[in-house]
Regions:
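Structural motif
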Residues: 3, 26-37, 92-93, 160, ...
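Short runs of predominantly hydrophobic/aromatic residues within well-ordered alpha helices
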Residues: 5-8, 34-38, 95-99, 110-114, ...
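Short amphipathic alpha-helical segments and their helix-coil junctions
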Residues: 8-30, 84, 97-99
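A general alpha-helix detector
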Residues: 11, 24, 40, 44, ...
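N-terminal interaction modules that seed assembly of large macromolecular complexes
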Residues: 21-68
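Long, amphipathic alpha-helical coupling/dimerization segments that relay conformational signals between
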Residues: 29, 103-132, 146, 151
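Aromatic-anchored, charged helix-turn/loop surface patch used as a conserved interaction hotspot
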Residues: 55-121
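Glycine-rich, aromatic-bearing surface loops/beta-hairpins
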Residues: 134-197
Length: 197
């Protein structure tokens, strides 16, 4: 398929190529059912605007693509993962060929989802924001998304959010801000999730 060029897609490909990010995405996708395209969108919007989207726009973004994610992207993803390593007595060369076709279909479906997000919620670039400000905005956007998507993943009063979630989101955010210290990013993510309880 041919798609129009868009900075959001280019941003996502760049971040996804960084060390640890593919594994972090898989961890939150499998462990928490999160939409990776939304995670990338919330980070991209923070980088572009230099401020949080706010809970209303975070929710609007999720509502824009929930049906597509649940009925198109996730079923393709599940089928692709189910075929990894073969499927029962089906010929492995055939199941592998089908799996490769599903990889391409999944990538196209994700690309379509990202273009839809960018169209439905336009963001405007604010160049004056520094990386610290953009980091705070990205972490706030992600925390708002988690609050509406998986409230039980938040920290109980006086407790800590799930460590695997903190680690995966910190790795993703570090891929967005490779110039910032990873320990600081992890602390910011943990604190933002804790505040939402």
């Amino acid at each position: 398929m041919d798609f129009p060029v868009h900075s959001f897609w280019d941003f996502s490909l760049s971040v996804h190529s960084r060390t640890g990010v593919p594994e972090a995405c898989l961890a939150v996708q499998r462990g928490y059912g999160l939409d990776i395209n939304l995670l990338f969108f919330y980070c991209w919007a923070a980088v572009q605007e230099g401020r949080p989207l706010g809970r209303e726009r975070v929710t609007q973004a999720a509502n824009t693509v929930t049906g597509w994610q649940e009925e198109v992207v996730r079923p393709i993803w599940k089928a692709r993962w189910r075929l990894k390593g073969g499927f029962g007595s089906f010929p492995p060369e055939q199941t592998e060929a089908l799996r490769k076709t599903l990889i391409a279909a999944e990538l196209d479906a994700e690309h379509m989802e990202q273009l839809r997000l960018a169209e439905a919620l336009p963001v405007s670039a604010r160049r004056e924001a520094d990386d610290s400000t953009r980091l705070a905005a990205a972490v706030a956007n992600l925390a708002d998304y988690l609050h509406t998507s998986i409230p039980d993943a938040e920290a109980p009063p006086g407790g800590a959010p799930p460590e695997d979630l903190i680690q995966a989101l910190s790795t993703l955010v570090a891929g967005v801000f490779p110039g910032l210290e990873s320990g600081r990013i992890r602390d910011d993510v943990a604190q933002a999730l804790k505040k939402r309880s």
